[in-house]
Amino acid sequence: LSCRDLSAQLSSLPHRATAATTTHTQISLRRAPAPRAPLTTAKRLQLPSAATRDDALASLVGQLEQNLTQDEEEDDLYLPDDASSARRRAAQKHQDELPARWREIHGSDDWAGLLDPMDPLLRSELIRYGELAQACYDAFDYDLASRYCGSCKYPRRAFFERLGMPDAARGYAVTRYLYATSNFRFPNFFSGRSRADAKLWSQRANWIGYVAVSTDEESARLGRRDIAIAWRGTITRLEWVSDLMDYLRPVADEGIPCPDPEVKVESGFVDLYTDKDPSCRFCKYSAREQVLVEVRKLVAHYTALGEDVSISVTGHSLGSSLAILSAYDIAESAANLSNGMITMGVQRAAVCVYSFSGPRVGNGRFRERFEGELGVKALRVTNVHDNVPRMPGIFLNEGVPEMVRRVAEGLRMPWCYSHVGVELALDHKRSPFLKDTLDPGCSHNLEAHLHLLD
């Protein structure tokens, strides 16, 4: 109620009556009125026509004071005070720093000083990219009774909206779906279906991720145009078999333009990344060809507009392996350059991997090429009780003495693996909200990792 409205209502009220002008009204006895509906705030503040100026003013002031007190009590009642909410408020406060700090969060200094204690801005960004990876699981159709088993359940243009991810829907637009297959003679993923189902969307292809680009509004918040690539983890039987193909293969043999034949990666991962089926319209091109074409197109478009561009690749489990392999391939193939050629004065789009619970991908020479010569950054989020990051290369890995590893690689032993990037190790047993269990899959769960980050 404004002062002008209050003055108008008070001026219309009669002054205090005197003895000479007092009148008496005969009141008839009637039945008690029915209960009235609760009055709204606006109606409670209306002045009675028979009230006097002084009484009305006192009543109004008292009612306003009561309403203010009630509002303050309600604010105190709903004010969050737990540690998690405090961290979220701190992260929101630091969001304004992201345009100036995005290269640091993207690993320009290998996250020095940001992991212990965890930087609140890095924490929020890790959770955000982890949710982009989780979306691959939530959108995958793994129902064997579905005619579209192995595909994505939602259309590309409504991907995040249909998943109920409004923040991601406002922040990113999916530009391409990614599909993969394998040419090994393994039992078909759809082996439980009869031949009468030959008209299924695809007998051999599987939807395995997507490429998205930040919107104009999100790019302003991030401080650059971000190209996000999310890879799905292991769900189907076919991919489990690929996980178990435990021997190294030179990447140059698979068409990746690496000048060093000693750079090797796990064979099952690279097969899933490079295999294709010309008879299938979804896998006519390999996952590698699909992602490189899309990244080149987006980088060329936005660098031509004079924007800073970053490439952020994320994935969980098998998706982590594909994320590391594709990030390496993008840098090795110069897909992060506007003209696709390594020339003086041309700036590369920064490439970073946010990996969750991923296995080792390549040998020691792959790590050297990945980190040192190409400058790709990787932050690996792991659970110390999860066995997947320990494989492959349980005995011969980056943890053995350098001399032993060099001798093993010189003898061309096929089980010498090395992790890439920086590790952020978490422990689910330190969380009071997660119960300890004998199921090893719980330690590998992506949502558990995101909870531990939060």
Which ranges hold each PLM region?
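Short, surface-exposed "cap/lid" segments of acyl-processing enzymes
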Residues: 202-256
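Extended, Lys/Arg-enriched charged tracts that mediate electrostatic binding to polyanionic substrates
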Residues: 155-215
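Catalytic nucleophile loop
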Residues: 320
